[in-house]
A protein has these predicted regions:
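Immediate post-signal peptide segment of exported/extracytoplasmic ligand-binding proteins
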Residues: 120-124
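Short catalytic/ligand-binding loop motif for oxyanion handling, primarily in non-cytosolic enzymes
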Residues: 53-56, 102-103, 139
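Histidine/lysine/aspartate-rich catalytic loop segments that bind and position anionic ligands
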Residues: 87-119
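Active-site acidic carboxylates
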Residues: 1-97, 126, 148, 152-155, ...
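A generic secondary-structure micro-motif detector
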Residues: 71, 106, 132, 161-162
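Glycine-rich anion-binding loop/nest that anchors nucleotide
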Residues: 125-138, 155-160
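Histidine-anchored nucleotide/phosphate-binding helix
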Residues: 35, 137-148
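Short, well-ordered alpha-helical scaffold segments within catalytic/effector domains
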Residues: 29, 113-117, 140
Length: 189
C-alpha cells in the first residue's frame, strides 16, 4: 500500500511578508522539510497556486471568501515555494488556478498535464498525508478531495497553518465528517 505526502501551497505569498500571509507559514515550511527528511513516504508531491488571470478571484476590495488580494502570480517571487521548504525530494508539482479560482490540489495539473489523482493512482498510492497552507482553505479542500477520490487521508495538523480560528474549526468539522484522520493541532493566525 503506497503512501504519499501532499505539500499544499507553501509559497512566499502565503508566508510572513507575502501578499496573503498566514501567521506561522515560514515555521510550517521548515517543519515540513524536517518531516520529509525523516522519510517514510513512497512519494512526495507539492501543489501551488499559480495564477495567470484568475478573473474575479483577485480584487482590490476582496471579501476573503470568493475574492482575494493579488497573490501567487505565475512567474513572480510570491508564487515561488518558501525558501525554508526543501523541495529536492518533491517528485511532481501540481499547479492550480491559472485562469480561475482553485483551492484543491486535485484541481491542478503537473507540467506534463497529469492530474494529481491520476499521478497518485499510477504509482499505487492508497494513503496520503496532507500538510501545508492554509488549513482552512487549500489544505481542507485538498484533503476532502483526496478522501472523495478513495485515498485513506490524514491531515498532519502540526504541519499546517490556518487563517482564523472560526474557519479552522469549521474546516476540521468538515474533514472529520468526511472521514479524514486528523493528527495534532494547527498553527492559527
Amino acid at each position: 500500500m503506497g503512501r504519499a505526502l501532499i505539500v499544499v501551497d507553501v509559497q512566499n505569498d502565503f508566508c510572513e511578508g507575502g501578499s496573503l500571509a498566514v501567521a506561522g507559514g515560514a515555521a510550517v515550511a521548515s517543519a515540513i522539510s524536517a518531516h520529509v527528511r525523516g522519510g517514510g513516504y513512497d512519494h512526495v508531491v507539492a501543489t501551488r497556486d499559480y495564477h495567470v488571470d484568475p478573473g474575479g478571484h483577485f480584487s482590490e476590495s476582496p471579501d476573503y471568501v470568493d475574492s482575494w488580494p493579488v497573490h501567487c502570480v505565475a512567474g513572480t517571487a510570491g508564487a515561488s515555494f518558501h525558501p525554508e521548504l526543501d523541495v529536492t525530494g518533491v517528485e511532481a508539482v501540481f499547479s492550480k488556478g491559472a485562469y480561475e479560482a482553485a483551492y484543491s490540489g486535485f484541481e491542478g495539473a503537473a507540467g506534463d498535464g497529469a492530474s494529481l489523482v491520476d499521478w497518485l493512482r499510477e504509482r499505487g498510492v492508497e494513503r496520503v498525508d496532507v500538510v501545508g497552507i492554509a488549513t482552512d482553505h487549500c489544505v481542507r479542500a485538498t484533503a476532502l478531495d483526496a478522501a472523495a477520490a478513495g485515498f485513506a487521508t490524514r491531515v498532519l495538523l502540526g504541519l499546517t497553518a490556518g487563517v482564523a480560528r472560526p474557519t479552522v474549526d469549521s474546516a476540521l468539522e468538515q474533514l472529520r465528517a468526511a472521514g479524514v484522520e486528523l493528527d495534532g493541532e494547527p498553527a492559527v493566525g
